[in-house]
Amino acid sequence: MLESHLIIYFLLAVIQFLLGTFTNGIIVVVNGIDLIKHRKMAPLDLLLSCLAVSRIFLQLFIFYINVVVIFLIEFITCSASCAFLVFVNELELWLATWLGVFYCAKVASVLHPLFIWLKMRISKSVPWMILGSLLYVSMICIFHIKYTGFMVPYFLRNLFFQNATIQTEVKQAIQIFSFVAELLVPLLIFLVAVLLLIFSLGRHTRQMRNTVAGSRVPGRGAHISALLSILSFLILYISHYLIKTFLSSLKFHVKRFVFLFCILVIGTYPSGHSLILILGNPKLKQNTKKFLCHSKCCQ
């Protein structure tokens, strides 16, 4: 019989899974309907749709991990499933990184020639960003299968089977390359883009406040809302990275509080940020309301 804290944890995991699947599914469906109506899709909608699809698969895998942890069913550690895990996880991280770059290029006010060039071409570059991410992540998966195929199954066996043993002396160069290629590069790109956007929005908000002191400035609330949305994106993104690094560097018993908390935090990012995207994007929010109202009327 399950302990009380495991029952509570599993209920939270189910709620998290349903919320994440629903919010990301809404993004895909709403943008899909918009594509059918107008026979074209805006670059931001395309990026959001691809990100939502990758997050749905990521939520499915996280929920599968939760089921394995709670009910101790057999975990599949074949090379194909591990390669799929790496593919979905890395693709989601890169698409989220490009989303931060897109917001930065569109919203931030920077007079540097390189930034102006990026601002003018970012919309046309979105399909190439997605294609480049797919190719890059595919190369990472091939690298894992060829050189480090045993590392992911070993990490998973360490979590789920305490008696598992394997030679732990892995080439340091391979480990460093994996860390840089999979975690450090997208993280640095994201940090530069989002911090630049936060500073730009903060500076613009202060200028608006100082220009008309004591009066209500139109658009000021929108800037504050955008700033809070980007800050929440940054917090969720960084916490996601920190927890993953923490999990990969230490050994845990799967039913201990620290491990369960880490898995819950990892699942919060793809579900929580997608909800923030819907609430913070006026077009997406309006189309979601129309879709939900239409669904209720059809019942």
Curated annotation (Swiss-Prot):
- Give the Extracellular compartment stretches of this protein: 1-9, 77-81, 146-178, 244-257
Give the membrane topology: Multi-pass membrane protein
Report the CDD domains cross-referenced here. Answer: 7tm_TAS2R1
Q: Please report a single Pfam family linked to this protein.
A: TAS2R
Residue ranges annotated as Cytoplasmic topological domain: 31-55, 103-124, 200-222, 279-299
What the entry lists under InterPro entries is as follows:
TAS2R
Residues that carry a glycan: N163
Q: Name one GO cellular component term.
A: plasma membrane
Q: Which Gene3D superfamilies match?
A: Rhodopsin 7-helix transmembrane proteins
Where in or outside the cell? Answer: Membrane
For molecular function, the Gene Ontology terms on record are: bitter taste receptor activity; G protein-coupled receptor activity
Where would you find the membrane-spanning parts of this chain? 10-30, 56-76, 82-102, 125-145, 179-199, 223-243, 258-278
Record's keyword terms, sorted: G-protein coupled receptor, Glycoprotein, Membrane, Receptor, Sensory transduction, Taste, Transducer, Transmembrane, Transmembrane helix
Remaining remarks: Most taste cells may be activated by a limited number of bitter compounds; individual taste cells can discriminate among bitter stimuli.
The UniProt entry's sequence similarity note says:
Belongs to the G-protein coupled receptor T2R family.
Cited function? Receptor that may play a role in the perception of bitterness and is gustducin-linked. May play a role in sensing the chemical composition of the gastrointestinal content. The activity of this receptor may stimulate alpha gustducin, mediate PLC-beta-2 activation and lead to the gating of TRPM5.
Protein name stated in the entry: Taste receptor type 2 member 1
- Name the encoding gene, please: TAS2R1
